[in-house]
Amino acid sequence: MSQEDAFYGKGSYGASSGNSNIPPQGFQPVYPVAGQLDNTAPYVGAVAEGTAEGIVSNGEYAVGAMGAAPTNIIGSVDQQPPVSHTSHKSRRQYPAEVFELTNTLAASPAPPSLSEPSYVMARTPSSSPYPHDRAEVGTKSLSAQFGGMSLGADGAAAMPTNELVSVDLYNQTPEISDLTSPPPPINLPLSYSATGAATSNCPPKYVRSTINCVPTTNSLLKKSKIPFALVIRPYTSLVEEDDPVPVVTDTIISRCRRCRMYINPFSIFIDNGHRYRCNSCGIVNEVPQSYDWDSFRNVQRDRWQRPELNYAVVDFIAPQEYMVRAPQPLVYVFLIDISFVSISSGMVGTASRAILESLDRIPNKEGRAKVAFIGVDSALHFFSVSPGAEEATQLVVSDLEEPFLPRNQDLLLNLRECRQGIENLLERFQSMFATTRDSSNALGPGLKAAHRLIENIGGKICCLISSLPNVGVGKLELREDPKLLGTNRESSLLHPNDSFYKSFAVECSTSQVSVDMFLFSSQYQDVATLSCLPRYTSGKTQFYHRWNASRSEDALKFASELTNYLSMEIELEAVMRVRGSNGLRMSSFYGNFFNRSSDLCAFPSFPRDQSYVVEVVIEDTITKPFVSFQTAMLHTTCNGERRIRVLTISLPTTNSMTDLYASADQVAIAQYLTVRASEKALSSTLNEARDSIISKLVEILEVYKKNLAGQNTGAAIPLQISTNLRLLPLLCLALTKHTGFRRSSHISSDLRSIALCYLSTLPTPLLMRYIYPTLYSLHDMPIEAGTVTEQGVVLPSALNLTSALLQSFGLYLVDTHIHQFLYIGKDAVPQLLIDAFGVNSLADLKAGRFTMPVIDNPLNVRINAILGKLRSLDKGSTIMPSLYLVRGDGDPQLRSWFFSHFVEDRSENSPSYLQFLQTLKEKVRD
C-alpha cells in the first residue's frame, strides 16, 4: 500500500485491497459488479440496522457562545489517534444541522417580539463565573448594570479562553467537516452587553474575524503573523423576507458624537440612564429625550425592548437628515449586443424572453421601477414607448463619436405604465434583427448613452455582450496569445487593456450608476478589461463560456440567472463605513465598490450576493477587555425607503499568543488570503499572488513551531498547528491549484479572469466550496441520503478530494457552486445506470452539459433531491450551477477538468497534499 493510500485509508473507501470484489461489511449490496455474482457487489443501497449518526447539512453556521464553555477542543496529537475517514464498513457521518440556541434563562425578559433572526447565541450558563440576571436590568440603578465589571486589562485576563490543542498535520487526514463548522467561539460574557440578550453579538454569517481574540498591541499581532481582517456580508439572502432582521421604526437614532458609532448592545448606560458611554471611544453621550417614548402609540416604552440594544444586526429607518435627495426609483437599462454573433447564438432571443418572463419579479411595490432598452451594433438603437401605447418606436443613432439621446422622453419607461408596449417589444426583439449581418459592437458609445440617460437619477446598466467591442470609444483588440499562458508574462493578459473602462466606471460611481456584465463567449471576450466596470461600480460579472442557446442547458442556466438577478432586492445609493474601537484602524478594503475616501466605500447599488473584506491595523495599545467593530451601511431600499443597516461585533482582547492562535478562524483567514492574492494577480503578477499565499502560511507555521508547539519526541519531526487551523494548509494548497492562480498553459485568460472575479466577491460558504469543492459518493450512499426529513433533504457525508477514494464502478458528484459534475466510472454496471439515468450502458450517456433525467426510481429521485438541495443552499446567490456528466471512459479533456478539482492529488506543476506538507516541513525547520 502506498503512502497516499495509507493516508486516506485506501481499501476502506474503495474495494478491499485484497479483492476488489469483496462487498463492504455491514451493507446490503444492491448493484452487482459487472461479471460478478449479485451477492458480491460493492454497491449499496442500504446501511446496517440503526440510523446514521448526524443529520442534515444546510450550509448554515452555528454561532460561538458568549461566555460559554469552549466548543472547539478536540484533543492533542498525543491524546488522540489520527483522524480517519468513515469507511464503507461503518455508517457514514452527516454534517450536523444547525439548530437555534434559545434563551435558557426563563426568568429573563425576552427581546422584542420581532421576527426572530436565524441567529441566536447561547447564553452564559448558570455555572459561569460571570453572573448575570437580566431581570435586574432596568429595575436597579442603571449605573449598576455593569457593576463589578473591570474595563482594564485585568478584566480581560479573567475571561474564559479557547484551549489551544496541537495536531501533527502530517499524521492526520484533513477533516473537511471543519469547513462548515462554526469558528472558535467569541468568549465574551453576556454581562458586557446592555441587555444580556443572546443576540447581542454579530453571528459569523454576517461578520467573521480572522481572530476572535484581539491582541492588545501591534507588536503581538506582528509577531503572531496571523492577518487581522473582517469578512463582511451585510445581506445573506436575495430577498429580505428570506432572512429578515429587526427594524427600528421610530427614526430615533443615537450616535456617538465623537466616533459616530451607532448605539448598540455593548453601549454602557450611566447616570440613571440619561447618558451612555460609547463602547468604541469611551466618550459619554446624551440619550435622546424621546428614546423611552413610543411616539406611534403615545405611551412609555421599555428601553430594554429596543431592537438596537438586543440585536447585533438591525435596520434603522433613517430620518430626513440622512437623505441628500428624495429616494430614486429602481432603474434598469438593458444594453444588448445585437451583432450577428449575438443573434446567431440565440443570446438576444433568450435574453429578451427571460426579461419578459421576469418583469413581474422586478421589485416594483410602489410602481416606480423603470426600464430602458438600447441595442448596439455599428449604431445605437433606442426604443421609445409612450405611456399606454402598445408598440415601441425604434430610433437609430449612427454617430458613435458623440452619441446623443434621440428623444428627451419616453426612452426611460415606467414598468407599470408602459407594460404592454414593453411586452410587445420584447416578444419581437429577436425577429427585428434576425437578418442582420452587422458584426460590429459599439459597446463604449452605448455605455456613454446609457449613462447619459440615467445620470440624474442613477440605476443599473445591464450589459448583455456576445462579441468583443470593436468600434467607437472603448474598442478592444484580440490580445490573447497562447504562447504567454503559463509564463511569467501571462499576467499582462489579466490587466485591463483600455483605460476607458476604469475612468468610465469612476464617472458612473459618482452619478450612482452601477454596471453589470453578462458576457457570452464564442471566442475571446477580454473579461479582464470588461470586468473593470462592475469592479468599481459595485456590479457583477457573469461569463458564459462557449455559450449557445441551441443547448437547452445553456439557455436554462442563463435564463435562470438573469431571472434571479432581476428578482434580487437591491439597495441603492449606498455607502458603507467600518468603525472600530480606539487604537484600531481599517487599512485596506477588498470587494466590488469605489473608495470615496480612506474608509468610505461607495455602492451605486448594493448587491446581496457578494461579500467584502476589511483589513485592520492596531495603532495604539488596547487597554480594554474587549473591542468593538461596527459596519454601517446607509442605503435606499428598492421600495424607496432610506435605511441604515448596522452590524456590531465585539471581541475580547488578550496579551497571549496562545489565546490568539486558539481563537483564529481558518476560514476567514483563507478568505482574506484569497482576496489579497486576487488583488495581487490583477495589479501585479500571478507569481506574486501565489507566493503571498504560501509565504503567509509558512510564517504562521514557523511562529507556531517556535512559540506554541510542544516538544518534539521520537525520531519524526512533526508539522504542528492548532486544531482550529488544521485545514489552513489544505485551503492554501487548493488556492494555488485553483483556476484563478494555477500555473498552466491550458487556462485561457478569460477563464482565469472570471475565476478571479468570483474569488474576490463570493460569500464565505460559497467561496469555500469554490476553493475546495464538495465530493459525494452517490452509488453507496446511506438510505437516509436524498430523503426528506423535517430539516429538509439529507445530504451524504462529504469525502476528501483525492482520486484515491474513487472506485471505477462508482457514481460521484462534485459541487463547486459554479459547476456540478456527475462522474460515472468506466466499470459501472447496467443496474446502476438504469437506476440513476434510465439507460442500459455507458454508451447511451452523452458526456458534457447534462440535464439529470427524472424517472420513477428511488435512486434517481434521491440524486435529483440532492442536486436540488445543493442549489437551494445558495439562497444568497444568483448563480445556477452548470451540470456536467463525466464518463470514466469519456473525453480526456472533460476528465482532466473534472480531476483538476481533486486538490489533494498531484497535478500539473503542483504537488499532492502530502508532498505539499513535506515541503512546508522543510521550510519551517530551524
Curated annotation (Swiss-Prot):
GO molecular function, one term: zinc ion binding
Any Pfam family: Sec23_trunk
Stored InterPro entries: ADF-H/Gelsolin-like_dom_sf (IPR029006), Gelsolin-like_dom (IPR007123), Gelsolin-like_dom_sf (IPR036180), Sec23/24_helical_dom (IPR006900), Sec23/24_helical_dom_sf (IPR036175), Sec23/24_trunk_dom (IPR006896), Sec23_24_beta_S (IPR012990), SEC23_SEC24_subfamily (IPR050550)
Span of the signal peptide: none
Any one Gene Ontology BP term: COPII-coated vesicle cargo loading
Binding site for Zn(2+): 256, 259, 278, 281
Annotated keywords: Cytoplasm, Cytoplasmic vesicle, Endoplasmic reticulum, ER-Golgi transport, Golgi apparatus, Membrane, Metal-binding, Protein transport, Transport, Zinc
Any single GO CC term annotated in Swiss-Prot or TrEMBL for this entry: Golgi membrane
Location of the region described as Disordered in the Swiss-Prot/TrEMBL record: 1-21, 73-93, 107-134
Biased composition (Polar residues): 73-85
Membrane topology reported for the UniProt record: Peripheral membrane protein
Gene3D superfamilies: beta-sandwich domain of Sec23/24, Sec23/Sec24 helical domain, Severin, von Willebrand factor, type A domain, Zn-finger domain of Sec23/24
Subcellular location as annotated: Cytoplasm; Cytoplasmic vesicle, COPII-coated vesicle membrane; Endoplasmic reticulum membrane; Golgi apparatus membrane
Main location: cytoplasm
Region (Zinc finger-like): 255-281
Protein transport keyword on record: yes
Job of this protein: Component of the coat protein complex II (COPII) which promotes the formation of transport vesicles from the endoplasmic reticulum (ER). The coat has two main functions, the physical deformation of the endoplasmic reticulum membrane into vesicles and the selection of cargo molecules.
PANTHER family (UniProt xref): SEC24-RELATED PROTEIN, SECRETORY 24AB, ISOFORM A
Subunit structure: The COPII coat is composed of at least 5 proteins: the SEC23/24 complex, the SEC13/31 complex, and the protein SAR1.
UniProt similarity note: Belongs to the SEC23/SEC24 family. SEC24 subfamily.
Protein name: Protein transport protein sec24
Lineage: Eukaryota, Fungi, Dikarya, Ascomycota, Taphrinomycotina
Gene name as annotated: sec24
